[in-house]
Design a protein with these regions (language model features):
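Active-site SXXK
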Residues: 1-8, 97
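Hydrophobic side chains within well-formed alpha-helices
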Residues: 3, 31-34, 61, 111
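Short gly/ser-rich anion-binding loops that grip negatively charged ligand groups
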Residues: 5, 24-28, 36-40, 55-59, ...
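Conserved beta-strand positions that form and line the central face of beta-propeller blades
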Residues: 6, 22, 78
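Acidic helix-start/capping segments at beta-turn-to-alpha-helix junctions
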Residues: 6-19, 121
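A mature extracytoplasmic/lumenal domain signature
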Residues: 11-13, 25-27, 52-54, 83
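Conserved catalytic neighborhood of penicillin-recognizing serine enzymes
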Residues: 16-48
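A conserved catalytic-loop motif detector
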Residues: 42-126
Length: 126
């Protein structure tokens, strides 16, 4: 996947609650724009769309998340969704988040480009 690949909004993603950018069904963002929306705005709608792009479905992506958590030694984590909104059985610890964060920053240092943004625009300046 490249930063210029497209992430398309599904019906499910467009109906997400919580923090969002009002991603409309069939609207597309580049991966670059999607990462910005996820990291800066905590956009749950875009998070679901990205999960669907990577995993084929959010459910499969969550399985991938849990498999990776086990591989990393995150012993007190169980993901139930991709966006982090409270759900029965969805939990983690500060220690496990630290393990995940170390892996993310070590293997994908470009993420710091997004997580250090305080305020920015998407969709041609909006």
């Amino acid at each position: 996947m490249t930063y210029q690949d497209k992430v398309k909004c599904s019906t499910k993603a467009s109906k997400m609650g919580g923090s969002q950018i009002w991603f409309k069904e069939n609207e597309e963002l580049t991966v670059d724009e999607a990462l910005k929306a996820i990291c800066v705005v905590s956009a749950n709608d875009v998070t679901v769309a990205m999960a669907e792009k990577i995993g084929g479905s959010e459910e499969n992506f969550v399985k991938m998340m849990n498999d990776k958590a086990k591989e990393l030694g995150m012993e007190n984590t169980c993901f139930k969704n991709s966006h982090g909104i409270d759900e029965e059985g969805h939990y983690t610890t500060a220690k496990d988040i630290a393990i995940m964060s170390r892996e993310l920053i070590t293997k994908h240092p470009d993420i710091l480009k997004y997580t250090s943004i305080w305020q920015d625009t998407l969709r041609n300046g909006t």
